[in-house]
């Protein structure tokens, strides 16, 4: 939601998931964070800068002012001399990854079914939760602080 009073706005309600994804991919704690908003009344167009305890950096461009023809969700990972580019959770291209160049899915898969199954298994079978509580609290705290900057 864009309404800051109902739902906390898009940083708390939506961009938080991208912060969470970067925490998962890096596997380390966020050391520093900053946000730069575009000058709009809705505060729904922003760039978020994250740095992690291992020196990794992450940048989230959460924009509401682009063309609908551009992929809505795009993730680029630069590591070990290679690049992975994920578009809309359907198309993955690899550059500089020996033996891998691309993968395409028929439909978008953001992992919700797998996450629900992991959550149910954690409760019913005593497995570890799919997302550690410390990560949930860290991402929530940082998302709230970023939304208030």
List the model feature ranges, each with a label.
Residues 13, 72, 131-134:
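Residue-level signal for the nucleotide or nucleotide-sugar donor/cofactor binding architecture
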Residues 53, 118-149:
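C-terminal helix-rich "cap/oligomerization" subdomain common to oxidoreductases
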Residues 1-36:
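Predominantly a Rossmann-like dinucleotide-binding segment in NAD(P)-dependent oxidoreductases
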Residues 18-19, 112-117, 143:
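A general structural signal for well-ordered alpha-helical segments in protein cores
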Residues 15, 19, 42-46, 133, ...:
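Conserved glycosyltransferase catalytic-site signature
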Residues 37-43, 53-117:
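NAD(P)-dinucleotide binding in Rossmann-like oxidoreductases
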Residues 48-50:
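Short beta-strand scaffold segments in enzyme catalytic cores
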Residues 7-9, 103-106, 125-129:
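Active-site rim elements
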């Amino acid at each position: 939601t864009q309404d800051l009073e109902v739902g906390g706005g898009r940083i708390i309600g939506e961009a938080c998931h991208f912060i969470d994804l970067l925490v998962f991919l890096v596997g380390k704690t966020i050391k520093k964070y900053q946000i730069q908003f575009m000058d709009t009344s809705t505060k729904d167009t922003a760039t978020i800068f994250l740095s992690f305890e291992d020196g990794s950096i992450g940048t989230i461009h959460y924009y509401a002012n682009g063309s609908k023809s551009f992929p809505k969700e795009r993730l680029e990972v630069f590591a070990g001399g290679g690049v992975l580019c994920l578009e809309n959770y359907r198309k993955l291209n690899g550059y500089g990854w020996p033996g891998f160049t691309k993968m395409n899915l028929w439909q978008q898969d953001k992992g919700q079914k797998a996450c629900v199954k992991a959550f149910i298994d954690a409760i019913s079978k005593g497995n570890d939760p799919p997302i550690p509580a410390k990560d949930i609290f860290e991402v929530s705290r940082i998302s709230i602080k970023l939304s208030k900057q």
